[in-house]
Amino acid sequence: MRLTNRRFSTFLGNALPSKKKGFIFMSQLLYLRTFSTHTSYLRSSWQAILNYKYIYQNAEAVQRNCINRNLQAIAETVPKIRSLIDEKESLKNEFFPLLSLKKEITLQIERCSDPNERGKLVNEAKGLKKKTEEYNKIISKVTNDLYQYCLAVPNTTLPTVPVGPEDKAVVVQKIGSPLVKKTGSLKDHLQIANEGINLEDAAQASGHSFCYTTGDIALLEMAITNYAMDFAISKGWCPVIPPTIVRTDIALACGFQPRDEEGQQIYELDSYTSPLVSSPKQCLIGTAEISLAALGFKKTFNNFTERKVVGVSRAYRREAGARGKENRGLYRLHEFTKVELFAWTHPSRSSEMFNEIVNFQKEFVETLKIPARILNMPTAELGSSASQKYDIEAWMPARQSYGEITSASNCLEYQARRLLTRYRNDKDSGFVHTLNGTAAAIPRLIIAILENHQQEDGTVKVPETLVPYIHKEYLFKAK
């Protein structure tokens, strides 16, 4: 499918400035690796439009939602949010009459011809100026505190989401059945790939949890990536190759805020900036969701129903504390290739779009002949931005358990309020809803394909859908 500049421009409509409407599709994927170190987050350099009224009027439900998501510290701030809103209103009620009085006295000074009376009015105006400045400082601090507390409040949770920790996940559907029986000859993906997955040299070059893929494994990685992109394009998703470096405030607006130090996933860049120039810090993306969401930053979509994009990029994650047998090999890397779906929809369409993304993921996994299951994930497993999340887990024979390969989230207007992404139609206007989903997390799909399609002779049968991309029916077959 060939995507012209005109078609891409039509796809985005009036949402982007004309200078950003051009697009050149690259059939060959080029990956740029970037060095980084970790520092701390900065606050956003713009103001999100938060729903203070909802939090105030539904404080008990908001607090319960935080507790259900295992965000006890944030739950404890909800009463403080209510008191700050009350305090701000009270201060404004005192402040505005002072402003009116100050304005009236200024007019009286201009009209006054009596020097003595004028002197009294000037002194009174000075006193009012000092008072209004003090009120301004207090209101500014209260407003900022209120904003920071509310910014940390997670999205509302849809009623269909199970309440509790990970073990409360509900199996919605199973896909296929195990192809490989557990026998003495069963191998894990590292044993199957042999030198095709080189962790040792990568550890010397980059550190723990990096890898080189070579030979048939490198071909398999490129085949899955290209197939995932073609699969998405055939279903109406517009291809994008996004930047892998974004501003940290963009990542924060998307909901990538750490619950604690160990949960922090973001690599921030430690780069020189001039003391004379104030510029936001940057970070490496953990998923293309972040840079794709930024396409809608401060934009208004006109004549809007939905927009759908699919991005391919490298992804970078710190994965702090991720060790152990289940995380060995390709399962949990600091850097990997990922194909991501992202959609903006009218609020009335987000539920339908969520189902479309999950069905896309299910069909994609089915075409690779990978046994899997679809899970409705519970509250404690939801990120701050998600109102619901479905995961697909693939059966991984060597570990005799399932491992996550995709996730899909409906973020409602959480990200749109923080990124100022709106829509305007003839009949209504407001904030869009955003959704995201994994099309292909390449390393884990490699694990699933190698282990589920391994043969007794040590080869791996290539799923039929990948044969046109890899140009062979078996991997590791002697020539």
Swiss-Prot record:
Keywords noted in UniProt: Aminoacyl-tRNA synthetase, ATP-binding, Ligase, Mitochondrion, Nucleotide-binding, Protein biosynthesis, Transit peptide
GO molecular function annotations of the record: ATP binding; serine-tRNA ligase activity; tRNA binding
Enzyme class: ligase
Top-rank taxon: Eukaryota
Binding site for L-serine: 287-289, 340, 438
GO biological process: mitochondrial seryl-tRNA aminoacylation
Gene3D superfamilies per record: Bira Bifunctional Protein, Domain 2, Serine-tRNA synthetase, tRNA binding domain
Cell location: Mitochondrion matrix
InterPro entries: aa-tRNA-synt_IIb, aa-tRNA-synth_II, aa-tRNA-synth_II/BPL/LPL, Ser-tRNA-ligase_type_1, Ser-tRNA-synth_1_N, SerRS_1_N_sf, SerRS_core, tRNA-bd_arm
Documented EC number(s): 6.1.1.11
Cellular component per GO, a single term: cytosol
Transit peptide endpoints, chain numbering: 1-42
Keyword flag Aminoacyl-tRNA synthetase: yes
Sequence positions that bind ATP: 317-319, 404-407
Catalysed reactions listed for this entry: tRNA(Ser) + L-serine + ATP = L-seryl-tRNA(Ser) + AMP + diphosphate + H(+)
Domain notes: Consists of two distinct domains, a catalytic core and a N-terminal extension that is involved in tRNA binding.
Summary of subunit composition and partner proteins: Homodimer. The tRNA molecule probably binds across the dimer.
Task of the protein: Catalyzes the attachment of serine to tRNA(Ser). Is also probably able to aminoacylate tRNA(Sec) with serine, to form the misacylated tRNA L-seryl-tRNA(Sec), which will be further converted into selenocysteinyl-tRNA(Sec).
Protein name per Swiss-Prot or TrEMBL: Serine--tRNA ligase, mitochondrial
Source species: Schizosaccharomyces pombe (strain 972 / ATCC 24843)
